Every structure is written in C-alpha cells, then in structure tokens.
A protein has these predicted regions:
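Interdomain/boundary linker segments immediately adjacent to catalytic/signaling cores
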Residues: 1-69, 75, 254
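Charged, low-complexity C-terminal accessory regions
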Residues: 1-25, 29, 175-254
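Short N-terminal secondary-structure initiator segments
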Residues: 28-50, 97, 140-159
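Charged, often glycine-rich, active-site loop that binds/positions anionic groups
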Residues: 71-87
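Short helix/strand-bridging catalytic loops that position acidic/His residues to coordinate divalent metals
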Residues: 74, 102-115
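Active-site beta-strand-loop-beta-strand hairpin of nuclease catalytic cores
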Residues: 81, 88-98
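Glycine-rich, often proline-containing surface loops adjacent to acidic residues and nearby aromatics
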Residues: 95-106, 145
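Acidic, metal/cofactor-coordinating or nucleic-acid-engaging core segments within structured domains
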Residues: 110-216, 220, 224
Length: 254
C-alpha cells in the first residue's frame, strides 16, 4: 500500500469515527450534544493519522519504544508545567520530534479557526522557550510538525466578511474582490496561509493541510490545496530527522 492509500485510510477513519460518535453520543450517559459538537466530543477521530505517523517513524528505523502518544506524550513547558502533545518521539533521553494533529469541520468555522491559530502559536512559543531554557536535557532542536484536516465545504471555501473599524487587513488576507466586497479570503485559504507562516517563522519544522468533504471522505477521498503543504513533504521532513538521528548515533559508536 503506497503512502497516498495509507493517507486515504486515515481520512476515512476520521469521517467514519465522527459519524459513529454522532450516532452513539449520549447513548450511555443519556446526555446528547447537538450539531457538530456531537461529532467530536468522543475524541479519537484523528487516531488514524497518529497511527499512520507512528508506523512511518518506525519504518524509518526508530524503535517503537521511542514513539509515544496518549498518556506518555506530555512534555514540560516554560509558561505552564506541561503540555500533552499528540505524538512525541524520545530516543536516548533526547527529544527528537513532536506533533499536533488538528481538524475542523463545519458549521462553526470562525471562532474555531481563531482558536486553532492562537493554540498553535501558544504551543510553539511555550515549546521553543522551554527548549531555550534547556528543559529537554541534551536534546538538539526537535522536529515539530503541525497537521490540519479541514472539511471541504461551502462554509470553508467561500470569502468571509471581516470587520475593519480602524485598519485594513493585510493584503494576503484580502479576497480577490476585496475592494468591492470588503471580504477576506476563505477559511481554507486562511489555514493555508497560517500553515505556511508557521514554517516560515520557524515555529514548526513542517506543516500539512488536507481537505476532505464529509461524503466522499467516508471513502477516503481528500485534496491537498497547496503544493508546499503536502503530506509527502511533511513525511519526508520527519523521516529526514529520523535519518539524521540514526547517522549521529552511528558516529557516536553506539
């Protein structure tokens, strides 16, 4: 099975899990959420991506005992005691890599998009400040990855009206008809710009943006809106870090 097929499996798992959670949520407690919240309160919808990345890291030569998620993925911070990352790689007491897997489906794109931006920026600031302060022992700068799966829908791909009471938004955030409509780019385009800037500003080593609609997504269908945010490049960057570690270990004589 090639990488694209394996990624399709993770996308399919995401949508199938959301659908199952929406159907069963509240069946045990009797408390029923409504709307999109019912899709996600059960968690685990991004587990397919986490499992795929774990497998790819192991295939690159890093022992499974070095790859951690769940209760063993916490790392100390600088502005807070600890942060539970979605996946962490620690080998020979050195922090090699860490990842965040995020998703967003409609209908509430606005507040959720802003929350995702603030969360990622805060996590990165906390991580690199902790690294600067030698919180992770003898570790060299770790590889930090950010993966976003966004629902491909009218709400995420249409221009958005934006308030400008004092100053205009930056040019890259303006829709092509901005001068007439005073609308910003879509949330999909915002996420594309955001992921690109995370890497440009060296807050994350690599970022990936995947889009999928909830109907064809059940079959594993997806698109990648930007060539520089593709999953293949994301994986290549990560496995490159693993190769770098293995070569360094060989030179150390281990």
């Amino acid at each position: 099975m090639n990488l694209e097929e394996r990624l399709a499996g993770a996308v399919r798992h995401y949508w199938q899990t959301r659908l199952k959670q929406k159907e069963t949520q509240g069946s045990v407690t009797g408390v029923q959420d409504y709307g999109a919240r019912a899709d996600v309160t059960g968690g685990k919808h991004m587990d397919g991506f986490a499992s795929l990345i774990c497998d790819l890291i192991a295939e690159s030569g890093i022992g499974a005992e070095c790859i951690h998620k769940g209760s063993r993925s916490d790392l100390p911070g600088y502005f807070r005691p600890a942060k539970d990352w979605d996946l962490v790689v620690v080998a020979d007491k050195r922090l090699l890599a860490l990842m965040e897997f995020k998703s967003q489906a409609g209908p509430s794109y606005g507040n959720n998009c802003n929350n995702r931006v603030e969360e990622a920026l805060g996590n990165a600031t906390d991580l690199w400040t902790a690294f600067r302060e030698n919180t992770f022992g003898d570790s060299k700068a770790p590889w930090a990855g950010y993966l976003m799966l966004l629902e491909d829908a009218a709400g995420s791909t249409s221009p958005v009206r934006v308030a400008e009471p004092h100053f205009k938004i930056r040019p890259e955030f303006r829709d092509s008809n901005y001068e007439k409509t005073r609308k910003s780019v879509s949330y999909a385009k915002r996420y594309e710009l955001f992921c690109r800037k995370l890497v440009l500003e060296r807050l994350y080593s690599s970022a990936c943006l995947i889009m999928s609609d909830r109907e064809s997504g059940l079959l594993g269908k997806f698109t990648e809106p930007s060539a520089d945010l593709r999953f293949t490049d994301f994986v290549a960057s990560l496995t490159g870090k693993a190769t770098e570690y293995k070569k360094a270990k060989e030179l150390e004589g281990h």
